[in-house]
């Protein structure tokens, strides 16, 4: 697969397919990559419908350059914008999974004219506040003293630096209202134990627009990767294209 080389000479792995517009860009979640079920399902959908499609890996994820702990939300936002500016053609539908949903909103605010619509899959904007609040006091003290901690969650362990927390707070989008006059669809599983089902409502309270939908899936979890979930995602893209 090809790599985009950024201004720091760091490689960002991506895959793109040609087709008609609007294009689709899939943005993976924290500590994930571009090879999951949702990304591959979207690629199949794009091929079937002859649509442009891109999936990529933020630095510190998958086979892109760098160590996870060396990057922040600002860095990953820059990766997405680099893909939009240098690889994508024309208008795009951004599909953001979990953390990718946060990056999706940040990119939409930075490049509004390039975005045809947004689809959040268990979107988790501003999640760092909640993450830090839930950290045990011992871990908070360790981070203050050493500037880095080892964190384990849902079977994964990774290093987190203090700058990750500080930078995340600088990138909050729900601290004030903003207008979005294009389609926004938030898809949320009611059995999600990572991003709670009340998050979509918090999001739409801060985003002002007339084309905003929330789709609650009763039997779906955070992964949103079963056949029913994938069909809902594909149908949502189709509805934005028809719109």
Where are the regions that the model predicts?
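Catalytic histidine-centered segment of alpha/beta-hydrolase-like enzymes
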Residues: 220-232
């Amino acid at each position: 697969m090809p790599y985009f080389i950024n201004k720091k000479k760091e490689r960002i792995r991506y895959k793109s397919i040609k087709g008609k517009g609007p294009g689709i860009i899939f943005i993976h979640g924290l500590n994930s990559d571009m090879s999951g079920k949702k990304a591959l399902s979207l690629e199949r959908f794009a091929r079937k419908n002859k649509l442009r499609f891109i999936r990529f890996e933020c630095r510190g994820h998958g086979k892109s350059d760098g160590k996870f702990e060396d990057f922040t939300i600002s860095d990953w936002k820059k990766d997405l914008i680099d893909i939009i500016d240098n690889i994508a053609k024309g208008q795009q539908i951004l599909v953001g999974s979990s953390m990718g949903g946060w990056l999706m909103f940040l990119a939409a605010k930075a490049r509004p004219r390039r975005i045809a619509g947004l689809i959040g899959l268990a979107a988790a904007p501003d999640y760092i506040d909640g993450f830090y609040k839930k950290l045990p006091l011992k871990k908070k003290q360790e981070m203050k003293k050493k500037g880095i901690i080892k964190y384990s969650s849902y079977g994964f362990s990774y290093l987190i630096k203090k700058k990750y927390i500080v930078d995340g707070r600088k990138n909050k989008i729900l601290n004030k209202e903003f207008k979005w006059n294009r389609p926004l669809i938030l898809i949320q599983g009611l059995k999600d134990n990572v991003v709670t089902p009340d998050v979509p409502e918090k999001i739409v309270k801060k985003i002002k627009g007339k084309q905003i939908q929330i789709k609650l899936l009763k039997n779906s979890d955070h992964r949103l990767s079963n056949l029913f979930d994938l069909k809902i995602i594909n149908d949502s893209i189709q509805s934005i294209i028809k719109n």
